[in-house]
């Protein structure tokens, strides 16, 4: 599939991958796209051991707080120093605690989750990843895109269902304006 669609894939400015496709397809796509200078976001869910060369090749990797410990075989107390090793690349989602990233010159940044009534967390991570990419595509810097994505994820958990919970651009902008 990847070979058949190589040209179309490489036309994209940003490629999003997740671990629900075969490992060989992920590895091939990451190498192909990084060699072509494309921006790559990798959501490593479901969590499994990752090839460190592939981690180095992606632009962003977005595990949740449990997945990061499984992938890097570490405990929660070391996640902050792990984020320092991957500045601006390792974005760790933490449910009701929000999302964290280490930004050079600014240190560890944790954006708190919106205080909302949670109905269903299904799809919150997917919403965050998609909104982060949408923010980047709209010209936002990483931290601004992450704020945008965090707001989108906060809105998404207020409804039942992954797709039904995904907010519109207008809803995210309104939530940010009211924040």
Regions found by a protein language model. Name each.
Residues 49-53, 76-179:
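Conserved phosphate-binding/catalytic region of the ribokinase-like
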Residues 1-110, 171, 177:
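Ribokinase/PfkB-type carbohydrate-kinase core domain
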């Amino acid at each position: 599939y990847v070979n058949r669609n190589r040209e179309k894939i490489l036309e994209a400015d940003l490629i999003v991958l997740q671990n629900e496709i075969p490992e060989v397809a992920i590895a091939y796509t990451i190498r192909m796209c990084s060699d072509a200078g494309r921006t790559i976001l990798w959501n490593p869910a479901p969590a499994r051991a990752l090839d460190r060369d592939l981690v180095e090749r992606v632009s962003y990797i977005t595990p949740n707080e449990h997945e990061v410990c499984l992938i890097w075989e570490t405990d929660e107390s070391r996640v902050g120093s792990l984020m320092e090793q991957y500045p601006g690349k390792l974005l760790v989602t933490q449910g009701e605690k929000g999302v964290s990233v280490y930004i050079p010159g600014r240190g560890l940044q944790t954006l708190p989750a919106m205080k909302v009534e949670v109905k269903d967390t299904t799809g919150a991570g997917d919403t965050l990843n998609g909104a982060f990419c949408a923010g980047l595509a709209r010209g936002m810097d990483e931290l601004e895109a992450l704020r945008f994505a965090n707001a989108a994820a906060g809105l998404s958990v207020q409804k039942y269902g992954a797709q039904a919970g995904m907010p519109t651009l207008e809803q995210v902008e309104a939530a940010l304006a009211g924040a």
